[in-house]
């Protein structure tokens, strides 16, 4: 597979009622258009501070290698702030220390389940970001065809590199996602399209990141949206309850599960079995 994040794939997209304030955005704009899950960074089932490469905020993974390290934390907006609209509660901070090598990299990724998503279409990414000083950032989409059998090699859309500053700024970037005509899927049902924000990338990754280069610094993100079309609509809010149900398709913290359960055992086999009903249907068996 690609030199990128691993693990459970992302989601096909949000569905259902739109929840909190501003849910549908502009008049006539459909609900469920944002294919990013937890783009408002509301749900953190695993904790709020991480240093290992991997998942932190639900559905969002920090990936680093080649001597680079990243500290990945939840941050709270000040009550009443006006820098980022609509009163979000949290944002994500990544403090990157580059390994300063050709193979060094740090990225912040979400996988969107099903590589067919957006294939052959124009999509628009919108998000708020800032850094500790002026830094470059590259946004990339990668189509991964899964494992098992003889799947096609991954394909990337043309990346976009640009500068971010030390003040919160909204960025809007439009991409042409390649067609998957003639491609072959793997048989393991783990294909996806990956959104990556690259913060550090040595020369080994030049073609994927428009020669971003090695850099260290603090990068912060809020209100990430990916939607079909060539323009960005207002950020689509969802209720906390709906968002956590979306997240639980991929990960859930099983603590004090509500509902009935039962256990059985046998003295002859010295085994015991416990059964419980999960609060959401998961993408694959846990």
Where are these regions (language model features)?
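Extracellular and organelle-lumenal recognition/adhesion modules and their flexible linkers in secreted
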Residues: 2-286
């Amino acid at each position: 597979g690609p030199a990128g994040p691993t693990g459970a794939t992302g989601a096909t997209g949000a569905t259902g009622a739109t929840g909190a304030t501003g849910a549908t955005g502009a008049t006539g704009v459909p609900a469920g258009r944002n294919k990013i899950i937890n783009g408002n960074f509301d749900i953190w089932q695993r904790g709020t501070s991480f240093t290992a490469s991997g998942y932190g905020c639900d559905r969002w993974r920090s990936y680093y290698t080649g001597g680079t390290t990243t500290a990945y934390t939840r941050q709270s907006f000040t009550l009443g702030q006006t820098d980022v609209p609509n009163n979000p509660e949290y944002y994500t901070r990544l403090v990157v220390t580059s390994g300063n090598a050709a193979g060094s990299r740090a990225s912040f990724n979400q996988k969107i389940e099903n590589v067919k998503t957006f294939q052959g279409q124009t999509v628009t990414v919108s998000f708020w970001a800032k850094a500790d000083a002026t830094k470059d950032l590259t946004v990339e989409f990668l189509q991964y065809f899964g494992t098992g059998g003889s799947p096609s090699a991954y394909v990337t859309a043309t990346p976009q590199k640009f500068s971010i500053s030390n003040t919160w700024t909204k960025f809007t970037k439009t991409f042409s996602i390649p067609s998957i005509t003639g491609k072959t899927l793997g048989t393991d049902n783990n294909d996806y399209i990956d959104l990556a924000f690259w913060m550090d990338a040595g020369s080994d990754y030049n073609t994927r990141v428009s020669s971003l280069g090695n850099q260290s610094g603090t990068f912060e993100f809020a209100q990430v949206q990916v939607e079909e079309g060539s323009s960005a609509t207002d950020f689509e809010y969802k209720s906390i309850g709906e968002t956590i149900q979306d997240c639980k398709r991929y990960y859930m913290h099983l603590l004090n599960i509500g509902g009935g359960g039962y256990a059985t055992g046998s003295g002859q086999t010295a085994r015991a079995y416990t059964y419980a009903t999960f609060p959401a249907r998961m993408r694959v068996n846990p």
